[in-house]
Amino acid sequence: MVGSKDIDLFNLRENEQIVSPCLIVHGKCNKQNGAKTVQVQHPQLPPITYPIHNQFFKATVILTPGENKLTFVTDTNTARTIVCYYTPLTQNPPVHLCLILAKDSPLQFDSPREQKDREGGNGLELAIKKLRLGARLMQAYTNEQMLRNSMGNRTFPFVEEFTWDTLFERPAMRNTIKIHVVRSEKTVKEIQDPDIAQQNSKGKNTGALFGIAMDALKSYGGPFTNNEKPVQAACMFLDTHWDGKLIRGHAALGGGDDSIKLAIFGSHGLYSWPTCLEQLVPYFTDETRSSTSEVANDCNECGTYWECLTITLGAFMHEIGHLLGCPHQESGVMLRGYTTLNRSFLTKEAYSVRTNSTGASPPIFPKEECTWNRLDTVRFLYHPSFTLPQDYYDPSFMRPTKLGGYPNIKHSVYPLGNGSCRILSPTGIYLIEIICDDLARGHIEYLPVSLGGQGPQREVIVTLDDLRARLPKNELAKFGNTFKLKILSVNAPETEFDKFPSLLDVQPLDMSKYGFSKNVQGIKSPLYGRSDGGNAVGVVAFDVRLVTAVRIYHGYALDGVRFYYKEKPTGTKDAPASKPSVPPRNYFSKITHSIKNHASINEENLKSVLFGHETQNFTDATLEPGEIIIGFNLRCGAWVDAIQIITSHGRMTDMFGNKDGGGFAELQPPNGQYILGVTGRVGQWVDAFGIIYGAL
């Protein structure tokens, strides 16, 4: 907080480095002299005036690259000057903001006659102005939320260009948000087809607008084709229309694929959005009743102009949240908490038809505002669009570099007995969510050291008791034995484990029936591949310390594996097992000591066990004296595509089979334990594969 005798600023410090082009500055006038307004003055920008209530104010401020000298002056001549520095992070992946037009679009959006008279129409240029300012408000709001969650000043960038900036009443040439005007191949009639309107309960294809937007972007070309990384795009359909019963040409959707991450929305509420910053407070407090003969009352929550602005701006931001990787949450923007988005910019709320009240009392404290859920902000922290330069000075951060197209890495879960398990991630786990009825009700986060955490973890031990203790009592009663676990890692797709408690409810296997000592017990790992495919094989046991060679049967998938081992001399006792050595876990680095393939196995005096099928196509791998198998890497999906053997000497074989098939998974017993055998399911080839592990 920057303090002075007369004015305090709560969320802006002297000489602070800012990465958002727009801020919501919270302040208080300590001098009780009846100040009603505060004006923000900037040497390069027009002044903007904001109201003061109960001595508090919220001022939405635009910044220019470099030094920004901001002076806050009340109408009673109380003043405070502060300097901050804005640095656009052009290296971060931006969001492209787009208006999608039908090929025969009249270039107009829905607007009541009164509003058209006030704003001078409802054409394309006005839509661009409104969308540009709305995007700046989303950036400012998100930056404030990240700051409140102790993650620093961070927000996502939009694509910008040097052109006429319309954020103020008087346009000027400077950097501002670029609005792509994208023509669709579809006509107005096709876009407004009731069958593809999302809110039409009888519609036959209510998700079609998402595909129409995707096709329009790809036809537009430029940044939306032939890119190395997925492109992020937030699109509004200009030709959305309220016909008195249905909003046509509108869908609120967010998601995408590895080429385009996409959010779409309709323009049915755009009439209520401000066109410039000077209109921000008047538009957020405009109690004019919506005329449903002219414009839509979306979800019956847009009874006034200001409520329409709040709902539609917030709902579009909700879809951008999906674009940025956020699922629905139990609270906040990703639930439907954006019905109070207006409060983040105001110190006094207007009358709400939706609630039949004047809402929060002045000056509207942060606890009464809409929020990004904590889990959203953690996702943003590990999203490439939110990167800060100083993140790279913290080795524990493991900064993400990809928006999609990840290597298909599967997390490994190893039950340990007693309701506990070990979770492995090759890239580092930063968040574990406990999912009850599709919503996260508890979580464990691994923030970087610079933000007070321990950094993403490649190995985590969790217990059912700890996970259940993180659930609210009502959720625990309903879902304590059935909750899902969702694991998020850096540069990797999310992984969900259904009915997670049952996964840990394992019964140790008595391994004495397989030739081990009486006290040896084994635990089955989860199966990778198709866990309901083929036929169950049971346990194929072997003493890994006696294995000298492996024969892998493979073609375009894994057919089988035969383990050759020395027979233990009669009458000898098991030697005490020493702790197996653990090689480095960087399986993506270049392999310099690979096991020799196609070696001839001398089968004399060797026994063997077979998992799967024996075929004419195989590769042999021979172990060195004292070398044991400590794990396997797999490529798997609907079956097991390929297998790689890892040894205690830090060596790995090639990936035998279809090395480009499926996703990557690893199987290794917990530290101090050994592989006691393998298990899985086999059909025409190996459908699923797992290990048995335990102490020796």
UniProtKB/Swiss-Prot annotation:
Active-site residue list: E319
Any one cellular-component term (Gene Ontology): cytoplasm
Keyword Cell wall biogenesis/degradation attached: no
Record has Ribosomal protein as a keyword: no
Record keywords: Cytoplasm, Hydrolase, Isopeptide bond, Metal-binding, Metalloprotease, Phosphoprotein, Protease, Ubl conjugation, Zinc
Known EC number: 3.4.24.-
TM annotation in the entry: none
Matches recorded under InterPro entries: Jacalin-like_lectin_dom, Jacalin-like_lectin_dom_sf, Jacalin-like_metallopeptidase, Metalloproteinase_M10B, Unchr_Zn-peptidase-like
Xref: Gene3D superfamilies: Jacalin-like lectin domain (2.100.10.30)
Coiled-coil blocks: none
Positions of Zn(2+) binding: H318, H322, H328
PANTHER family from the UniProt entry: MIP04191P (PTHR21054:SF2), ZINC METALLOPROTEINASE-RELATED (PTHR21054)
Family: Belongs to the peptidase M10B family.
Record-given protein name: Putative zinc metalloproteinase YIL108W
Origin organism lineage: Eukaryota, Fungi, Dikarya, Ascomycota, Saccharomycotina
